[in-house]
């Protein structure tokens, strides 16, 4: 990492550098835009451009000082059309008081005053200059300064402050937004001093796949579900499935008093007669005579 040009109070800690490296904020694209060359550290043999983490931290501090200079936090507009940054900008807006636009940027938000979504921000922060090109273009029409998270191949036209970082990874995007929010709160005095840890975890700024979360929740419900609860009802679940469901052999026609007797009813005399017969009755004789009677009345 190159020597820092910041005052000693703004120097990053060892933990900050390790977090930036763990989130792969230093891994850029294989293509390199000419205006991003000052932020290049080296190029790996496989062609991947490695960004300078020291420059990334310097630009995070510079962007935070610009944000703090805005009197009304609501005049700051944070934008992310990339899905990996939508959760991050919403969390950043909730912690700093900025206005978030997560998702598609409606053309005319900054230039067409007739639309209901018309805004006049004093500062615009975007996640990716390529996907948020419409917002940057409209900001240039109305002279709004722009701060952007720029990769090695990101276009920097009409970008006033470029934060060199990996703006395609979900962890890299979330971590940079988290560090930017923490630095803003430090400069505003919300955090007592720079040694005070922020109680908000970086995981809150990371992207979460809704389908993966839904599948995880459904898998947990299926594991906690008792087998057969939907088929037999809650009564059988309460009994613990202790009843005998299948009966075969000579006892197929027997009906025990323990399973059939209701509370307060005396069925003992009847049960002894039912079980007294040694021969298993099939029941075909009794039903056959009754079923044959309607056959004689087919003539009208």
Curated annotation (Swiss-Prot):
Keywords: Cytoplasm, Ribonucleoprotein, Ribosomal protein. It is found in: Cytoplasm. GO terms for cellular component: cytosolic small ribosomal subunit. The keyword Ribonucleoprotein applies. SUPFAM superfamilies: Ribosomal protein S2 (SSF52313). Residues 278-300 are annotated as: Disordered. PROSITE patterns: RIBOSOMAL_S2_2 (PS00963). GO terms for molecular function: structural constituent of ribosome. GO terms for biological process: ribosomal small subunit assembly; translation. Required for the assembly and/or stability of the 40S ribosomal subunit. Required for the processing of the 20S rRNA-precursor to mature 18S rRNA in a late step of the maturation of 40S ribosomal subunits. Component of the small ribosomal subunit. Mature ribosomes consist of a small (40S) and a large (60S) subunit. The 40S subunit contains about 33 different proteins and 1 molecule of RNA (18S). The 60S subunit contains about 49 different proteins and 3 molecules of RNA (25S, 5.8S and 5S). Interacts with rps21. Belongs to the universal ribosomal protein uS2 family. This is Small ribosomal subunit protein uS2. The gene is rps0.
